[in-house]
Amino acid sequence: MKQNQPNLNVNLNNRLQQQQLNQVAQQQLQQQPLKNTKQNPINNQTNGILNNKPITTSSNIMNSDNILNNNNNNNTNKPSSTFNFNITNTPPPPVNKQKPITSSSTSKPSNTTTTTTTTTTTTKPPSNSLPSSSSSKVKVNSLTSQNNNNNNSNTNTNMTTQPPTFNNLIKPQSLPSTTGMNEIKNTPTRTTTTTSTQHTKYIKEDIVVKENNNRISNMNNNNISGASGGTTFNSYNYLPNNTLDNFINNSNTTTTTTNNNTNNNNNNNNNNNIINNIKQQHELELLQQKHIEEMKILQNEQLNQLKKQQKKLNESDTDGSDDDDDDDDEYGENMNLSPRTLRELKNIQRLKNLEKFSPPYLITKKTSPSIKTLPKFPEWTKERPFLNYGYLANISTNYTSLILPSKYEQTKIQLSSIPNYFREQILIEDLLSTMIGIEGECIHIGVVQENEDDSLQSNLVSFVVEGEVDPSNNDLVQRILPLCSYYSFVNDFIQIRYAYEWGIINHSLCFSIDQLLKEYLVLVSQLEGQLKSERLSLQRMWFYLQPTIKTFEILYRVTSEIMRCNSHGVQVINLLLKLQSKYSSDKKTDDLFHYLIKATTLPFLEMLDLWIHQGIIRDTYFEFMIEENTDLKRDNINRDFNDLYWEQRYQIRQDQIPKYLQSHALKILTTGKYLNVVRECNQSISQQQQHNKSDNNNNNNNNVKLNSQQQLLLLKLNTTQQQQQQQLSSTSASMIPTTIIEYSKNENVYIDKIEKAYDYASGILLNLLINERHLISRLKAIKHYFLLCKGDFFSHFMDTTYDELKKPLDQINMVKMNSLLQLSLRTSSISEEDEFKDDLECEFIPYKLVDQLLNIININNFNNPTTTTTTNTSSNNITATTNTSSNNTTINTTVNTTLIQSTSAHEVLKTNKLFGIESLAFNYNVGWPLSLIISRKSLIKYQIIFRHLFLCKHVEKVLVDTWSQHQFRRSSYNKPGLSTLLSFTHLLRHRMIHFLQNLEYYMMLEVLEPNWNKMKNSIKTSKTVDDVIRIHNDFLETCLTECMLTDTKLVNILMKFMSLCITFANFTNEMMQDEKNIDTEQIKKTISSSENKFHAILKVLMDTLKSFSKTESNRHMIHLIHRLDYNGYYSHYFENNPNLFKNKTSSSSNKSNNVSPPLEPRFSYQQQQQQQQQQQQQQQQQQQQQQQQQQQQQQQQQQQQQQQQQQQQQQQQQQQKQNQIQQQKQNQIQQQQQQSRGSTLPSNFSFQTALQQQINTTSATTTTSNQSPHTLIDDLKKRAYGILDSNNTKKTLERTSSSPALDNQSNSLPMTQSISQYAEKLKNLRAVIKNDELK
């Protein structure tokens, strides 16, 4: 683009010069009229033209033959015009041919049949300019009319033109026309009719205006010949300044006229007049140059401001900033750009800075090396979209009036002056051009408003028809124009999605659409052929294009939806399936979608076929549904295998799964994984097939006894078969004889092939694991070592390594441990059975089993999941050292890669005092691909079970050793009372051994052995590797749960029991060693306390087992309950001794359930006594603290009691005062009653109202009394007698004490009325009462 800047600068200078030249020429011609105007009528005519309206371009004379020759050269590659029509009514008369005379005095024959001299004064674009990309254009040949006086006026008016505006001048691609204007001169002798054929000529605008002092001399050297018959000139052709400069520089401008040998004098006079006119024009140009130089200064100031704006736009592009500075230095002040050019530069820079549509994986995986190696198209294809033929519908650009690439020009043909038939032909020609993305003569691109949104619909190109068109034709054209817009959009979509980064699925879609576009172009060419044969009309064209419009509408919807969703890979397929269900209402549309989907899914199905049949992924553009994590690598797959490799090496992309394979995505993943495993084992799939066939043949041959001749024949056949198999394997070593998957509407086709591939891959891998890698024998070896199935090996190993395991963890010699392990393996029965005994190694875990189990169970207590740290057991990396003071330990802890690391959890689990017995574990080296089944997680589960069983065996061994020592030293016990104590210890020890033996028997014979047999049988009948993995994991999970290692409560109970047994055994052994310092009372207390602890632990364990066994998943615990509580021994014992655990409840509640006492080796008796003394001191301190607390509490209680007593006394005094006040009031009332002697009954007293009130209150307030109306009347009667009889007031109060509610109401009655008012009422009431009493 920067290389075109000088040309654009020249265009602006040239046009500004033309504008100023026209203004100066107008002023000079008005002040100084031209010479010889009277002598030459032609000059009179030109003078009239200049005086009527200002001239726009300098009038020069050019040989018409040159114009015709140039036109013929430009149109050599164009098809001939399809039709010609005349504007005038008179036919063209014959004319004479003349050879033009050039400046070099050499004559060349002309190819034209008419000779005219034309001058142009144009402001409109050329009427017949032919773009280089158009297929065919219509040439309009205008024929001039005959010479007459009436036509002279018309031709003169046609010669006058309007001056060009600035908007027309700044268009860099506006083409000046060469419209001829005929001037006819009337002669007295004859009237000649001449014809001037209107031709088109494309004149370049990038011509620099240069001064040439030899113009006049060159013109004087030209030999000009005149027309015969007294006719000087028939017409002039006025050309713009550009054509004049081109004419002068090339020395090719000549004048041609019809030659007549009889009129030489007239020709010479005419030639002289022409030369004078040229001289005058040259003088005007010299005057205009001064004015142009002054305008340059102002122009440069304006352009400097525009340059600053352009530099701001180019600052974002760091690569191009240096080039811009170099260009500015090179051109300097001479680089002048038009405003339109600057707008185009600004738009291109804006497009470059805009965020381009890119696939999603380019944003998420910018650092991937595979992304960096993707090929790309050059940047100029994006920066300069006008070089591509799809620029009309560039999706990233909205075409406004400032951005259109020299489009939306005025109509080049005036349709109003053309007949209807030819007007329709012009419209058809323009439609054919717009159908392939090219503007026509009358159909242009519609201007898009700048305020419109930037959606995809706004980027759809709209075409506008200009000029006067019939309504019927306009309607047909408007129906066809959407097809042109759809074609431009779809074509640009193809150009964008053909980029490399969009992937092969998008490429296949673009290829399928491109095939449809080729057929579309064939249809356009067929329509053009009918147009040339004049058999095509708009109606016929609409009839032919109706199905095509519907097809392109669907293509537009598909492409626009893909662009809107920014779909990539399989997303395009899913989108096509969605649109198919939405728009496929008829068969043709369904067939179109089927064609697109079939072509689009072809590369995906090839990738799928390669994955499920060979286990290979070829996905350069991240389009396949399986993603390969290339960052996850393994240096040595046989020794240091990581489970993450199998789980995370291949993963499913959820957004790239086709809808018809959604339910089978996991099966597709595992199928390719299986084949990849076989490939990782350095064994091709085809070789595996051949190996299976050869094994079957060998087995059949071994079973049948053959003669010697038959054996020779079989050998020959086998050799020939092997040769054929080798040839096949050499040609296609990695190919499987399977059919390629093809697209089908029936999903069962895919499902059947995927199922077959899955069964085949799983069968190959199972055969590899079971038959070649001996999976069952490996599992049997792990059972022997980790599950303690071989008693002779384990007992021998414990005896030989017991002294070493008593040491602390940092003092254990790993070389010695491994050597002792191998010794015990060689000397036991396993040495003959197991071929893989060398893969077993010793390993020490630097924390206790309790901490490990509780950490796994309560893994959410930590911020991050914990890691199990293991010890490196390789004898090559570990050196044996016995120096405890050295800082370098013999055990190097390494973090396992199966779980996530958590330093905080590791520090919590790690203990300082840890012995070899507590941390011993086995490690087993499993090679690839057996590590798929026996993974690192599975080995950790085996280690947990082994550590638990080993701890039980160790406690059992310690208890048995104590019994043997007691039996050995029993004869030396002479101290009285000691034998009875030992009998109690034997009894408790026997109970502990019984508990341990039954627990071991339950775990080994009722949990591990039956579950292992089930696993073995199910593996033999399994069909896939995933089934084998699932069966093995289920076996380990059931073993852990049934061995009571997955519940915190059960784990704490078991660990407390183990620690109790260890402490009791150490106590009894140390007691026997120090016979002199034996304290019988202290021994009795320790024995009784340990017995109580044992019973408490056993009772809690049995209660928890009973509660757990109620659920169906824990029915297995019933067997352990029956074994521990055989014949209800312990249950009856606990029932007979209900007070056994009452004293222990308070102490046990204070202790935490999650922490168990550490397991320690045997200590001396003195050390144990010291520990007991320390414990006693601590207990005394605790008791003192408790006493102090109790005293404080008692004091507080006494204070509270005193306060309560004081409050009660105050309340009693207040009540007494209130009672006294009430008694005083009652006395006053009685005195008043005695004075009145019963005559003081209230005047307003009413028995009926009182009775009703009494009934209402009793019914509303209480329902417990259940009083009847008769009792109410009795109460009222008593009250009335009491009021009348003042002497018997006390008696009435005692009688009514049983009804306090009535008393309250009676007291509330008013007593101001007199008895005289209610005497009659009282009599009636007494009569009623008497009747009631009688009843």
UniProtKB/Swiss-Prot annotation:
Chain ranges passing through the membrane: none
Record field: compositional bias (Polar residues): 41-57, 170-186
Extent of Acidic residues compositional bias: 316-332
Record's keyword annotation contains Lyase: no
One Gene Ontology cellular component annotation held by this UniProt entry: spindle pole
Cellular location(s): Cytoplasm, Cytoskeleton, Microtubule organizing center, Centrosome; Cytoplasm
One of the GO BP terms on file: microtubule nucleation
GO molecular function term, any single one: gamma-tubulin binding
Annotated segments matching region Disordered: 27-198, 250-274, 308-341, 1144-1171, 1287-1309
Domain of life assignment: Eukaryota
UniProt KW keywords: Cytoplasm, Cytoskeleton, Microtubule
UniProt cross-references to InterPro entries, sorted A to Z: GCP (IPR007259), GCP_C (IPR040457), GCP_C_sf (IPR042241), GCP_N (IPR041470)
Compositionally skewed regions (Low complexity) per UniProt: 27-40, 58-89, 102-168, 187-198, 1144-1156
The UniProt record lists the keyword Transcription regulation: no
Family under the similarity heading: Belongs to the TUBGCP family.
Function comment: May be involved in microtubule nucleation.
The protein, known as: Spindle pole body component 97
